Amino acid sequence: MFPYPTLNYPPMAPINPMAYRDPNPPRQVAPFRPPLAAQIEDLRRSIANLTLKQRAPNPPAGPPAKRKKPAPSLSLETKKKRPPPPAKKQKRKPKPGKRQRMCMKLESDKTFPIMLNGQVNGYACVVGGRVFKPLHVEGRIDNEQLAAIKLKKASIYDLEYGDVPQCMKSDTLQYTSDKPPGFYNWHHGAVQYENNRFTVPRGVGGKGDSGRPILDNKGRVVAIVQGGVNEGSRTALSVVTWNQKGVTVKDTPEGSEPWSLATVMCVLANITFPCDQPPCMPCCYEKNPHETLTMLEQNYDSRAYDQLLDAAVKCNARRTRRDLDTHFTQYKLARPYIADCPNCGHSRCDSPIAIEEVRGDAHAGVIRIQTSAMFGLKRHGVDLAYMSFMNGKTQKSIKIDNLHVRTSAPCSLVSHHGYYILAQCPPGDTVTVGFHDGPNRHTCRLAHKVEFRPVGREKYRHPPEHGVELPCNRYTHKRADQGHYVEMHQPGLVGDHSLLSIHSAKVKITVPSGAQVKYYCKCPDVREGITSSDHTTTCTDVKQCRAYLIDNKKWVYNSGRLPRGEGDTFKGKLHVPFVPVKAKCIATLAPEPLVEHKHRTLILHLHPDHPTLLTTRSLGSDANPTRQWIERPTTVNFTVTGEGLEYTWGNHPPKRVWAQESGEGNPHGWPHVVVVYYYNRYPLTTIIGLCTCVAIIMVSCDHPCGSFSGLRNLCITPYKLAPNAQVPILLALLCCIKPTRADDTLQVLNYLWNNNQNFFWMQTLIPLAALIVCMRMLAALFCCGPAFLLVCGAWAAAYEHTAVMPNKVGIPYKALVERPGYAPVHLQIQLVNTRIIPSTNLEYITCKYKTKVPSPVVKCCGATQCTSKPHPDYQCQVFTGVYPFMWGGAYCFCDTENTQMSEAYVERSEECSIDHAKAYKVHTGTVQAMVNITYGSVTWRSADVYVNGETPAKIGDAKLIIGPLSSAWSPFDNKVVVYGHEVYNYDFPEYGTGKAGSFGDLQSRTSTSNDLYANTNLKLQRPQAGIVHTPFTQAPSGFERWKRDKGAPLNDVAPFGCSIALEPLRPENCAVGSIPISIDIPDAAFTRISETPTVSDLECKITECTYASDFGGIATLPTNPVKQETVQFIVHQVLQLLKRMTSPLLRAGSFTFHFSTANIHPAFKLQVCTSGITCKGDCKPPKDHIVDYPAQHTESFTSAISATAWSWLKVLVGGTSAFIVLGLIATAVVALVLFFHRH
């Protein structure tokens, strides 16, 4: 009523009326408080008044009472001697409630610790007959029976699992997929579930809690904790849950850490230490850069490398923003470098912004460029507004505004970080990156085709403003992303001639402060060494020495364009900032097609804005798929049958349509109208029928005329010999009657023996064959009859009703189950969905490969050799006679004695985590169905049933067995490929036999396993003189080639209207074959006839009817029940379906019901309680040619012929009237002939 609530303040004593009051007191304006805060404050005060204290009663009206003066003696004593303050009462720990205690007891009984070195490292829980143990938790389960179980590894979920012993299966926790938002229980209290994330207050839970279950109020497991990450005041948990189909799902927040108690150890100079606590704490990169890089290199393969890197980078840094601190400070361990660029705008050169790699695997034209310059970093720290590059031997920083990227036109910079640039570029064949440094301009161009990759089935060229969201690939800035690294190492030696000078006729090596220099001198003996201070050699010419500045305080990218350092060099790694991830992108939505319906014809008027894909398939046994790109406005026609047609236009969802038995004419009209009606429905059959009728009529007319004419001539021949002889009409008719005479059996056999002995023996063998057949039937009856009767008896005792229903979703099966002495019970079974779940075996995963080219080893004035390394498709080759230069200066003394060892191998690209294909072998599977059942008063009970003919399903008190399918069919071949959300039948090569340039050239069992196989035809080439690089040739990616030529998925070409789903791999709702059903209905569902309501004066009248339509029939049923109550209607025919099966009947009135039928003349028996009536009528064809639901159709021509058509047909070819007319015609013809002959 009011915009703000009235506050109820606590009662106060009334103001003394005799006290002095200002006649004009200032108005005190109460501070404004929002309505919600006011309500909360009001509620708090009310609760405080009611529960916390009892307020004193209000003083009576009048002057205030006099206050007593305090005694002075007491105040002095109080000042002198104060009592000690009372001891603070210790707060009692709140006891857990009943619900929490129950969950704690369940957890303690079903959760077992995992022991490692005498301490608890994590937990394993028993759920649903299996024991689950986190894979990252090492140790042994503290239970003898569970510890003896052989566990299977599921690395994708970071779990190990195994079946518990039979004696423990009854005492396990149950899981549930229902997770409504709210609070759940675990060992440390409450867990909040909101926005699909489990969170706890920060500081609750941590190392050692991995494997603990999260329970709901009923004690069911909703998740298993594996780790967590701090997010502000709360901690987000990394958990494993289950979806609605019982499939395990892993939910890991970004940056989560496993919560195993065991600390992963790292190593440095044979000393082990916790990876998150380096030994020289607070030893940081800023204090000891070389030692820090060495420590990281020695722990390159440690699974706690990220913790060590984080500790080394941030150990003395002040608190900053989390994303900036985690990401950008890592690259302070690296520096830019100068490398070879194939095209610097004029020719090949050594560029400070050389392009290492260009990746364009994201959608919407976004590319990622890796260069030799660095972005977002200055020489001494992080600054997003700057970029740094090598200006000769020194590092220089400039504003990022000087950077430019272009293809065929300038690109838009999206982000930059480390060595990487993220840009959105127009299509082009080359990528150019450059910057301006005052008057100097540095560019590098690389041949790379950039394309705008649209999402979905429409080839748009620019990101749309609005449309539909579809899955796509994007580059994102992920924090501490496991598995996406860029490989680094300490740079090799770089010659610096500025360090050499002539001093007192000798070559002097000048060492910068705090640096080391390695030198080679040949005068005439070769001398080499490392010095950290100025050094004078015995050489007299600068050309006789080479000086190399040792830079061991920074990493550089492990590039094939830089020489590798001498000796055994270790490698480091940093996180790739822009990693590909799955995301949602806006795709265009083509204008809806203008649809026109004709008889069994669908006409689509299409008006695409850009090339749009149109696919169609039939929903019958022959899919007959079509696939075409529509680039301009056009009109397409498709034939639609009763089996249905599915078409998909662009990014719109697929639509299914069915043809109705519509047509011109009327099956209940005159002959020409009936012919028009059937000609539209069955043109070929109608033409054949009409031709047959015409032929029968012509033969019927010609044959009697010719016969009568011949018989007349025979009859009047004797009279022609006598002149003026007249034949009476009656005699002429009697002459036409052919005389007959019957022979006995002996005469017939005698005739056959004398004239046709073959036919004689045939006639004799017929009785013998009949006798043999009868004897065989009697023998089979006595032998197999009792067993057959026993089987039938057992079947009848086990199941009340058996039938066969079509395997079509949405079309119900209806029947009437009768028992003697009981009223019939209506039974309805409807398939909600069907699933064929095959047994699959994942052979391997394939994806796009990435060629890794390490820095080459250049051996000056000597030879080197290759060693084998366990890398897929590893290639190594030594080239002699190389003469490399480094930024304009010679790298080696010798001219032809130098050697270079080039290496290259293949690894997974970063996109493999989101863009890969899985190769499966598919075997025979099981069929499951969800059915809705109605019997008697029990309505719509749903159940999941195995369609195998063996496994029963309980539905209420009824027992149902369905199956097996009449046709063991599956849309899958023996080998299928799953790519994204689509499935393809493809005969892929076996594991380990992939060929270069084809599907399977890169294979691994999982997306993270080390069993990588590759065959890419990688060949190393000889490097060019004067350039440090590693040229090679290689076959194009077979995975990318397969993606271009993969064809249409099974969702577009599978027959019988199958829909292909994943997790697990299965086809759904395939309308193939039929399903036997057997149901045992309990006795409680039947009603005795004496207790059944009675209805009298039944009369059924069909007022309107349209066959093959969705409840197109309307019938009226006048009723006069004994008493007003709800009764049930039962139809005895399967082809008639009632829309409503129960209805209240009044004392005197009528009931109108809708029904669906496929017959032209519906005639079905309708039973109301114990009374029955037959409903008959005529139905007209539907007016709608095409509908969006499956309609019922007659399957044979004879059942589709109306009674009117049969009547006209009988009249034409064989009715009684036809014989009468033909007899009259014959009589008239004979009479006319005799009359004209007489005269």
Swiss-Prot record:
Positions of region (Ribosome-binding): 96-110
**UniProt-annotated site: Involved in dimerization of the capsid protein, residues:** Y184, N217
The segments labelled Host transcription inhibition in the record are: 36-69
Lineage, top ranks: Viruses, Riboviria, Orthornavirae, Kitrinoviricota, Alsuviricetes
Can the keyword Protein transport be found in this entry's annotation? no
Residue ranges annotated as motif Nuclear localization signal = 66-69
Q: How is the protein altered post-translationally, as described in the entry?
A: Structural polyprotein: Specific enzymatic cleavages in vivo yield mature proteins. Capsid protein is auto-cleaved during polyprotein translation, unmasking a signal peptide at the N-terminus of the precursor of E3/E2. The remaining polyprotein is then targeted to the host endoplasmic reticulum, where host signal peptidase cleaves it into pE2, 6K and E1 proteins. pE2 is further processed to mature E3 and E2 by host furin in trans-Golgi vesicle.
- List all Basic residues biased stretches: 79-101
The name on file for this protein is Structural polyprotein
Question: What happens on changing T880S?
Answer: In strain: PE6 vaccine
Question: Which positions are glycosylated?
Answer: N49, N270, N637, N932, N1069
* Enzyme kind, highest EC tier: hydrolase
